[in-house]
Structures are given as structure tokens and as C-alpha cells.
């Protein structure tokens, strides 16, 4: 890339500037950019414009006028690190620490994501359709698109495995996972791996915390998180330090 400090636009699942979105991966990416002090603007995105058909995606504009679109929060982060636009937060981790960081991200992004997704899209589908990410679509098309999305997510959750559990089993797994993450955070003002600054896992964790505390389609998850003091202290601290310009959850 021609410039180490590009002009960056993050395309998210809502228009509102100064507000968290319901997507953990959008908030994760925004946290990652703020951890490296890279400024950006936000706009509402569409799945049809995203290179990989999902949110978030970004437009990177260089000083020479060239621009590119990238999807997937992890791939966007790796590209920006490679270009020198943001710092590599994991550069000084030992191999064991790097493995722990990756394991935490996998717990959040490859397990908790599906547990939370079931609560949102299956247990609280109408909230997701009429208040959440589909709410900007006109009503009649929204009904049709909503049923298509519901069918796709139901099949995905069944194939992945979460959809095969009973509601009680999913609730137990969700509580178990959040409680384990709360234990990882522990007491005191520190980051997940106990260092002086955040790592990639911290961006993932804050993404899941802020989106879960903001969304109205996951009341059980929100109640769990609000009942875990270490996680709430962590979320409050990151919000105050890096997102003071954003409206906080209630």
C-alpha cells in the first residue's frame, strides 16, 4: 500500500454515529482500530456491497487515490498491520501467550457467537427483524427477507451443532461460557493476558460485551453479563478509555 495511514471507512449494521452496533465483530474492529489510535469514519453497509457478503467491511483510501474494500474483522486487522497502519498488539507475546490469546478468541467467536446467535435469531427473531439489523428494510420486503434469513440461520445452527441442543442446554452453555470468561478477566484493572496493554483477544471480548449489553434481542445474555462484576468493570473501563464518545449501554 502506498500510505501507512490510510483514510478508513468502516461499514456497519446501523447508521447511528456515536453508538455501538449489535454486531460483536463490528465493535471488535472498532475497538481494534481505537487500540491503535487509527481514526476512521462509519457508514451503514450492505451485505451486497461487502466482498465476502458480511459485516463489517472497510474501504481503505490511499493518498494516491487508490481504494480497496475488505471484509472480515480478522482479515482487515491483518491487512492493516501488514501495511503499518496499526500496531501488532500481539508482537511481544510468547508462543504460549499467543496460543492463549487465540484460544480466547476462538471461545468467543467460534462458540459464544453461536450461543448468542441462537438467542437473538431463534428465541427473539421478531426483535432482530423489526428492531435490529433488518429494521431499515421496508415492512413487506422485510417479512420475506426475514423468513429467508431465519431459515438460513436455523440451518447453520443445526449444522454447527448449537441448534441441536434444547433451550435449557443452550442457556446452561451460555452461562458456563460467560462465567469462564469472567474468571479470565479476574479482579483489578488489567487486560485479559495481564499485560500493560490490550491484545487481539481484548478487542474480541469488548466486541462481544458491548454488543451484548446494547442489543435488545439478547435479554438473557445481557442479564448474565450484568451479573458478572469483573466483566462489567472491564467493559466500563474500556468504554471510558476508548469509547467515551459513544452512548453507553443502559
Identify the residue ranges that each predicted region occupies.
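GST-like domain detector, emphasizing the conserved glutathione-binding G-site
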Residues: 2-143
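Intrinsically disordered, low-complexity polar regions and short flexible loop motifs
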Residues: 230-237
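GST-like fold's C-terminal all-alpha helical module
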Residues: 114-230
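Amphipathic alpha-helical segments that form well-ordered structural scaffolds
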Residues: 28-35, 79, 173-184, 237
Amino acid at each position: 500500500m502506498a500510505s501507512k495511514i490510510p483514510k478508513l471507512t468502516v461499514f456497519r449494521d446501523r447508521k447511528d454515529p456515536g453508538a455501538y452496533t449489535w454486531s460483536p465483530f463490528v465493535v471488535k474492529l472498532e475497538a481494534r482500530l481505537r487500540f491503535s489510535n487509527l481514526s476512521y469514519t462509519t457508514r451503514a453497509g450492505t451485505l451486497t456491497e461487502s466482498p465476502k457478503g458480511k459485516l463489517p467491511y472497510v474501504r481503505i483510501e490511499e493518498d494516491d487515490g487508490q481504494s480497496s474494500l475488505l471484509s472480515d474483522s480478522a482479515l482487515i486487522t491483518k491487512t492493516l498491520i501488514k501495511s503499518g497502519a496499526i500496531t501488532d498488539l500481539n508482537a511481544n507475546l510468547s508462543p504460549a501467550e499467543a496460543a492463549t490469546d487465540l484460544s480466547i478468541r476462538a471461545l468467543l467467536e467460534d462458540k459464544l457467537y453461536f450461543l448468542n446467535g441462537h438467542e437473538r435469531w431463534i428465541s427473539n427473531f421478531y426483535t432482530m427483524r423489526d428492531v435490529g439489523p433488518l429494521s431499515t428494510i421496508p415492512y413487506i420486503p422485510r417479512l420475506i427477507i426475514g423468513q429467508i434469513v431465519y431459515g438460513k440461520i436455523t440451518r447453520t445452527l443445526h449444522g454447527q451443532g448449537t441448534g441441536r441442543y434444547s433451550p435449557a442446554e443452550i442457556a446452561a452453555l451460555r452461562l458456563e461460557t460467560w462465567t469462564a470468561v469472567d474468571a479470565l478477566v479476574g479482579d483489578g484493572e488489567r487486560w485479559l493476558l495481564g499485560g500493560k496493554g490490550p491484545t487481539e483477544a481484548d478487542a474480541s471480548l469488548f466486541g462481544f460485551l458491548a454488543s451484548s449489553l446494547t442489543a435488545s434481542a439478547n435479554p438473557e445474555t445481557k442479564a448474565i453479563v450484568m451479573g458478572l462484576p469483573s466483566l462489567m468493570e472491564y467493559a466500563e473501563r474500556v468504554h471510558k478509555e476508548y469509547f467515551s464518545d459513544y452512548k453507553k449501554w443502559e
